């Protein structure tokens, strides 16, 4: 299995976690919702895979480029 890191594309605050590690996600599946500049931005997986790591919690601040999660793809 190949490990792919998910990075934050914009700075903001984690508003809501949608899934926990161990969950199988489809391509473009939402991992969490980021609040930035009064907008809610879904953070999604680029490919289908299993969420193996989640490095953020609700309320956490993230910066652009932070590694926020990792998925395993076949």
Across the structure, where does each feature detected by a protein language model lie?
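Short beta-strand-turn/beta-hairpin segments enriched in glycine/proline and small hydrophobics
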Residues: 1-13, 33-46, 73
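Preference for bulky hydrophobic residues occupying beta-strand positions
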Residues: 8, 17, 32, 54, ...
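Short, ordered coil/turn segments that flank beta-strands lining enzyme active or ligand-binding pockets
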Residues: 10, 20, 47, 57
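Short histidine-centered loop motifs in beta-beta connectors
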Residues: 16-20, 24, 53-56
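Helix-adjacent hinge/juxtasegments
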Residues: 65, 73-74
């Amino acid at each position: 299995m190949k490990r792919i890191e998910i990075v934050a594309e914009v700075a903001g605050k984690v508003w809501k976690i949608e899934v926990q590690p161990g969950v199988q996600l489809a391509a473009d599946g939402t991992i969490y919702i980021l609040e930035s500049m009064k907008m809610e931005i879904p953070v999604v997986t680029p490919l289908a895979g299993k969420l193996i790591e989640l490095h953020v919690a609700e309320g956490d601040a993230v910066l652009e480029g932070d590694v926020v999660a990792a998925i395993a793809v076949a």
